[in-house]
Amino acid sequence: MTDNNHYENNENSENSSENSHHEARAGAFERFSNRKKRFRENAQKNAESPNHEAPSHHKKERHPNKKPNHHKAKHTPQKTRNYAQEELDNNKVEGVTEILHVNERGTLGFHKELKKGVEANNKIQVEHLNPHYKMNLNSKASVKITPLGGLGEIGGNMMVIETPKSAIVIDAGMSFPKEGLFGVDILIPDFSYLHQIKDKIAGIIITHAHEDHIGATPYLFKELQFPLYGTPLSLGLIGSKFDEHGLKKYRSYFKIVEKRCPISVGEFIIEWIHITHSIIDSSALAIQTKAGTIIHTGDFKIDHTPVDNLPTDLYRLAHYGEKGVMLLLSDSTNSHKSGTTPSESTIAPAFDTLFKEAQGRVIMSTFSSNIHRVYQVIQYGIKYNRKIAVIGRSMEKNLDIARELGYIHLPYQSFIEANEVAKYPDNEVLIVTTGSQGETMSALYRMATDEHRHISIKPNDLVIISAKAIPGNEASVSAVLNFLIKKEAKVAYQEFDNIHVSGHAAQEEQKLMLRLIKPKFFLPVHGEYNHVARHKQTAISCGVPEKNIYLMEDGDQVEVGPMFIKKVGTIKSGKSYVDNQSNLSIDTSIVQQREEVASAGVFAATIFVNKNKQALLESSQFSSLGLVGFKDEKHLTKEIQGGLELLLKSSNAEILNNPKKLEDHTRNFIRKALFKKFRKYPAIICHVHAT
C-alpha cells in the first residue's frame, strides 16, 4: 500500500468516526445497528489478521476539516499514524469491551458481559500476584544457602550463597556475648566453612555498616582475603577497623559499588538497592543467578520521611517483583511488632522539648553508627546555642568519616574537646557519647562511675539514652542507669516517648516487602527462632504457600531451584571469642576454664612426696579460691592432706616411680574428694614432685 492510500484510508476512517458520533447524538437506532455490525466485522478482521508494527514513515493524521497540504507533505518527514485513535474509531480497544445487550428487557445478557469483565480482571490480578511463570521453570540450576550467623540469635550476621562453581559471602558481623563469658567482649562467626570453599568464593558482599554486619571483617581478613564490595560508608568504616588491626594493605580488596548498577561477581549478577535503616547508605541486594533471582533485604524499614530525604527504593524492588523472584530473604528482627515502625524524623520534636527544658548539661548516648540520630541531636544543640563535645572513640571516628564523605554537614566551630567542657556554663554544653549498651569501658559508664578523666555526672545533668538494650545487654544497661540515678541526674530512657525508634520493619512493612517482591520461596532471616517463625506467619497471610517457606538455623544448608526448596545438609557452625581490648581471638578452652573457675572455684596443690616412705613432705602447700571462707581454709587443707597420705600409702611402685601417673593419680583423688564435699568440680591446679 502506498503512503497516499494510507493517508486516504485514515481520512475516511476519521470522517466515518465523526459521522458515527453525530448519528449517536441524534439517537438514530438504525445507525447504532450498523455501528454494532461494523464492530463485529472489525473484530473478525482483527482476529484473522496478524498484528503488525506501524511503519515509521507514516504521515501524521490531520483533522478531517483541514485540507491536505500536499506541498508540505512532499518535503517533510512522514510521521507515525495514530493507531490508538484508529482503534478507538473502530470501536476496538485492548482492555475494553463494548456492551452489546443494550436494549434487552432483563439484565441476563448484560450481567453475562459484566461477568466476563470480572473474570478477565481476576486473571490479570492472579498473574500480577504470581509472576513466577516469567521465571525459567525448566532450569535445572539451583543455589545453596548456608547461614553462618544471624539465625537463632540477634547479630553476628553472615551467609554464604553458592553454586557448584562460585560463592559469595553476605556480611561478616559480630554479636555480643551472653553473661558468663568472662573476658569475652565480642563473638564472631566460625570461619571453618569458608576455609573449605575458599577457592570458589568470589567476594564478600556488604549490605550496610552496622557492627552486626561488618564487625567480623578484620578477623576474617586475618585468615582469608577476598574482594570486598560495599557502598562508600560501609567501606569507610571497615577501612577504619582495618587500620586499628594493622590491615591497611588489605584496602586493595575494596570495591566501591553504585546503587541501581548491577555488577558481576563470580557467577552472580548483584545490584545494591537503597533501603532505609538506622544507618546511612544501607542496601538490599538483588542477586541474579541461573536458577532465578534472589532478593536479600538486609536490615530494613520503610521510612517515607527519612532525615536525608532518601526513602527506600520501592520502585526498584517492585521492578524485580514484576519480573519474577525465586527467593526472598527478609529481616525478621521486628516481626512481633504490629503496625509500622516510626520514621527516624519523628524523634525531632521530643529532642526539641528536652533541650528546651534542660537546665544543665545535656548528655546524649546512642549507637555510634546511628549517624542520623547523632546528626539530629547535634542540630538541636546548635539551635539552643550549646557547644558540642563528641566523646568516645567509635562515636568520633564514625562522625568524622560521615562528615569527610559528605553525608552530613556541621559547622566545625560548634565543637569542643572533652577537656574544654569545664570552661563553659552547664547550660551551654551538649555531650554526645557512647555507652548506650552499658559497656564498662564506654565513656558514659566512666562518667557515671567518676572514672572519666575530664567529666563526671552532676545532679543537674539531663542524660538521654536514645537506644534500646540489645538482648543480653539488659543487666549492663540497668547498672549504668543505677549509677546515673544515684548521681541525681535526670535520665530520659524508655519511659520517654519518641526518643528512640527502631531501624527494623514491623509487620505492615514486612507485608509491603512481601507484596512488592511476590517471591515463590521465602527464607526469613535475622533473628531468633521465634522471630523467623512469626515472620513466616506474616508471609503466609500475604499469599506465600507454607510449603514454600523454610525456617533456617545457623549451619543449615538449604538448596533452592525454580521448582523446589529443601534442606540438604548441616555444616559446623558456631562462635569464636574475641577480647576486643587486644583485638585477639580467645581459644575456646580458655573460655571454658574461666566458666569453670567462676562457677566452681579453684583448688591449687603443690605436693612434695617421699617415694621411699610413701608420705607427704611438710613443704607441700594447698590453697583454694571460691570454695570456702578463710576460717574454713585450714580445715579443708587438713582433709585433703589426710586423704592424700592414705592414697600414697596404698599406691604401688609403678605409680610412685612414674611422675605423670603419680600426678594424675593425685589429681583424680582431689577432684573426687572436692566433688563429694561440695557437689562441684572446681578447677584443679596440681603439681607433684617426688624424691
Q: Where in the sequence are the language-model features?
A:
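His/Asp/Glu-rich metal-coordinating catalytic cores
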Residues: 100-205, 210-424, 442-456, 475-477
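Residues in well-ordered beta-strands of folded domains
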Residues: 146, 162, 271, 432-433, ...
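Conserved hydrophobic residues forming the short capping helix/wall of the S-adenosyl-L-methionine
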Residues: 242, 539, 674
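Conserved beta-strand scaffold positions in the cores of enzyme catalytic domains, especially
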Residues: 145-147, 254-256, 327-329, 463, ...
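Broad gene-expression machinery/nucleic-acid interaction feature
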Residues: 267, 282-284, 602-604, 684-686
